[in-house]
Amino acid sequence: MLRWFSFGSNEGSEVAGNGWSVKPIGNMSIKKDDPVGFPQGYQCLLKVIIQLEKKDPTKSDVSELIAGWVKRYSGPHLLERLIKALIILTVPKLSRENIDNHVKLGGLFEGQVTFHFSSRDLIPTKYLSYATSIRTTVKGIYSYLSIEAELNPSSHQGTSVAKLLRASDVAKYYDNTLQSIFSQFEIKNVTITDDQIIFN
């Protein structure tokens, strides 16, 4: 089962929502008759913690901190786009905790997710964990970001990442198309079909 867990809570929320259409942009395209690609399921675990020394941080503050991580990603190459896709899913659901003069945001995504690839050579089979922590300033505000991810290959097929991205609050939170969100997170070489996202 796919669930998002709020920071400091044992209660999760399930995926809900309707699909939405997308249009081609850059190196992405939409084709109705594309092959399904090679599916690979993973048991995914992603933990995100953000701390900002500001009593009332904005979504822009969080976005700028995440953008800095996107540009400095230095983890496993084949795992990069998968982790970024999970980050896109998780950030809109981060919970908030006020502590003195700063705010802590956090969340945990856990579940079986299926990704589709245009070639078996693109399927990550090793170096499937990633962890980083960043201390920096955003608009003069001391900021901290911690990301931990682990993907374990599974013979079982879970919910496709395309369905998750379309069924969650992604479009509403980012107020943009899926292609533009991918561009923002520097997720390249992707084909978007009516019901799939294929990593090329």
UniProtKB/Swiss-Prot annotation:
The keyword Iron does not apply. The keyword Membrane applies. It is a peripheral membrane protein. Disulfide bonds: none annotated. GO terms for cellular component: host cell nuclear membrane; membrane; virion membrane. It is found in: Virion membrane; Host endomembrane system; Host nucleus membrane. Homomultimer. Interacts with viral nucleocapsid. The lineage of its organism: Viruses, Riboviria, Orthornavirae, Negarnaviricota, Haploviricotina. This is Matrix protein. Plays a major role in assembly and budding of virion, by recruiting cellular partners of the ESCRT complexes that play a key role in releasing the budding particle from the host membrane. Condensates the ribonucleocapsid core during virus assembly. GO terms for biological process: viral budding via host ESCRT complex. Keywords: Host membrane, Host nucleus, Host-virus interaction, Membrane, Viral budding, Viral budding via the host ESCRT complexes, Viral matrix protein, Viral release from host cell, Virion. One of its GO terms (molecular function) is structural constituent of virion. Its main location: virion.
